[in-house]
């Protein structure tokens, strides 16, 4: 139960206010009204209480719908905001985030933890004595480790009246250290509000007096609107700089928020918000119209879908949304709301569907290139936009399938991963066995250190070289330098592979899963990396053009990916 006595005992245990002072403080704290509210809504907890408080006070959080879309649906996130009014700032941002996701907490003044129905949402810090308990620091750590949202008011105290107007006090840098630890994106929020003249006058008299007025300031905003602006998220790779101190990064974040307030471009490069998910029932209905190729070993359904001029295509929108989520998670992505391009209309989409959760597990975009050549010519083939083709590529184009834009959405990572995708490809090849080649661009994240990219390109050029120069990148990756090539002996594949893993490990990296998978599916000579090039339209990743000759497919891989579906087709 919220009471003045509890607050005083916790924050000012030495205080002995006179009866008349206590009576005044109870009024300033709206103790009676809080207790009546708590009695009336004792069944509510957490975010439900936040919504009810705002409804009770008739305060409307005026947040544009587009701004709400800036809040990512999953993954660790640090929201940084100015702190103009006090308690209401935290409630407004909790309410905003709850429209999108429920795993949110706010770092706030210890006094507010006495609002018991809301206490589960608060991580308390002691702004009065400038201390933060170890337990609170652990809570912050756990919140981001679990992939949740953490709201910070880096000023630590409510904004003050200055010569330049109402401004936050100097920001603390604690949020930078936590966000860096979990590589969390930052999301700036600007609350356009101010307190009363009485409040700002109190800040000139005492540091403690403004705290006593915070509840009064919240209640005075009854029957009003609280405008909130949420900016685009700043990916970790865009805000973090190992050469800068936490204090310097904090200053840049404050500058970025100030630019948001003014409606100007911020200090950091931002990303568009990822689009909201499509209706599950619509997706299920669309997939039931598609060709079913079979099932994976654990029951995921494999569908083959093509747009075929369909005007409204929720499946394609969802594929584009999930692609962008998966690619951003590994430092790639288009930076757009959905990763969709002009090739998606013509191409086939191999989709893995989880019937139980009504989720697209992952997908491959692909096209038998002979069909597309007859229909659109070379310009209709995606990889041709990245690589020039030699005439000797004709055999591959006539008897091959171009693969690309493969993804597994992050919630399914670590289960069967790429095995799902290869099972899907195998299901298609079991039904259409006359194709000999698989080929397409395979990316190395632009987020990897340059040294790691150089090592990967050098290794795959050395051990999976093109027998003929069938293609050449339009933006060639530089030739491997002698000192990079010298890292590998070139005589024993396994020794060099172990060396590559060790060198990448020293850089905090690993072999990209698709590169690992392609290098393992065939007998020697069955896989080639024809050329490598840079892709500025895809977050500056490196594209390697891989070519797989299916006649070299290892027997165990054939049985696992293709043979299993042949048996299923016969039994069907």
Language-model regions: role of each:
Residues 1-80, 88-92, 99-101, 119-120:
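Membrane-anchoring hydrophobic helices of lipid-metabolizing enzymes
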Residues 358-363, 401:
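Glycine-rich phosphate/pyrophosphate-binding loop shared by adenosine-nucleotide-utilizing enzymes
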């Amino acid at each position: 139960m919220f009471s003045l006595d509890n607050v005083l005992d916790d924050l000012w245990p030495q205080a002995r206010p006179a009866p008349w002072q206590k009576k005044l403080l109870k009024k300033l704290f709206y103790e009676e009204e809080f207790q009546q509210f708590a009695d009336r809504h004792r069944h509510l907890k957490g975010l439900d209480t936040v919504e009810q408080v705002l409804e009770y006070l008739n305060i409307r959080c005026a947040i544009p719908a587009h701004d709400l879309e800036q809040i990512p649906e999953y993954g660790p996130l640090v929201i940084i905001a100015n702190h103009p009014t006090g308690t209401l700032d935290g409630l407004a941002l909790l309410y905003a985030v709850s429209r999108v996701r429920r795993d949110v907490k706010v770092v706030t003044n210890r006094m507010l933890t006495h609002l018991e129905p809301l206490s589960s949402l608060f991580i308390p810090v002691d702004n009065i004595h400038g201390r933060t308990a170890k337990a609170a620091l652990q809570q912050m750590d756990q919140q981001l480790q679990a992939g949740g949202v953490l709201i910070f008011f880096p000023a630590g105290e409510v904004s003050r009246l200055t010569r330049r107007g109402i401004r936050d006090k100097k920001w603390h840098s604690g949020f930078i250290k936590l966000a860096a630890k979990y590589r969390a994106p930052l999301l700036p929020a600007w609350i356009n509000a101010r307190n009363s003249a009485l409040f700002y006058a109190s800040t000139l008299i005492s540091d403690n007096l403004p705290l006593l007025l915070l509840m009064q300031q919240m209640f005075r905003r009854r029957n009003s609107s609280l405008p909130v602006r949420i900016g685009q998220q700043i990916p970790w790779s865009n805000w973090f700089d190992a050469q800068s101190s936490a204090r310097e990064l904090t200053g840049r974040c404050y500058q970025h928020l100030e630019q948001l307030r003014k409606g100007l471009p911020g200090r950091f490069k931002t990303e568009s918000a990822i689009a909201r998910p499509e209706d599950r029932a619509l997706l299920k209905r669309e997939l039931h119209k598609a060709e079913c190729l079979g099932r994976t070993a654990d029951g995921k359904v494999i569908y083959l879908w093509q747009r075929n001029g369909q005007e409204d295509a929720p499946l394609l929108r969802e594929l584009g949304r999930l692609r962008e989520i998966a690619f951003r998670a590994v430092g790639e992505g288009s930076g757009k709301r959905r990763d969709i391009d002009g090739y998606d209309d013509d191409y086939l989409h191999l989709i893995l569907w989880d019937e139980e959760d009504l989720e697209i597990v992952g997908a491959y975009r692909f096209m038998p290139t002979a069909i597309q050549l007859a229909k659109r010519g070379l310009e209709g083939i995606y990889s041709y936009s990245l690589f020039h083709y030699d005439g000797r590529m004709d055999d591959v184009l006539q008897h091959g399938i171009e693969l690309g834009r493969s993804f597994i959405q992050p919630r399914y990572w670590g289960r069967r991963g790429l095995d799902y995708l290869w099972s899907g490809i195998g299901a298609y090849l079991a039904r259409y066995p006359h194709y000999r080649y698989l080929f397409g661009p395979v990316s190395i994240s632009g987020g990897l250190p340059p040294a790691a990219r150089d090592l990967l390109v050098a290794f795959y050029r050395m051990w999976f070289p093109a027998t003929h120069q069938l293609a050449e990148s339009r933006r060639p990756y530089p030739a491997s330098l002698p000192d990079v090539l010298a890292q590998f002996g070139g005589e024993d594949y396994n020794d060099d592979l172990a060396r590559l893993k060790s060198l990448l490990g020293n850089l905090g990296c690993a072999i990209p899963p698709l590169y690992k998978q392609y290098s393992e599916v065939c007998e020697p000579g069955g896989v080639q990396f024809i050329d490598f090039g840079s892709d500025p339209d895809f977050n500056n990743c490196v594209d390697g053009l891989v070519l797989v000759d299916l006649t070299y497919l290892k027997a165990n891989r054939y049985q696992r990916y293709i043979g299993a579906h042949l048996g299923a087709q016969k039994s069907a």
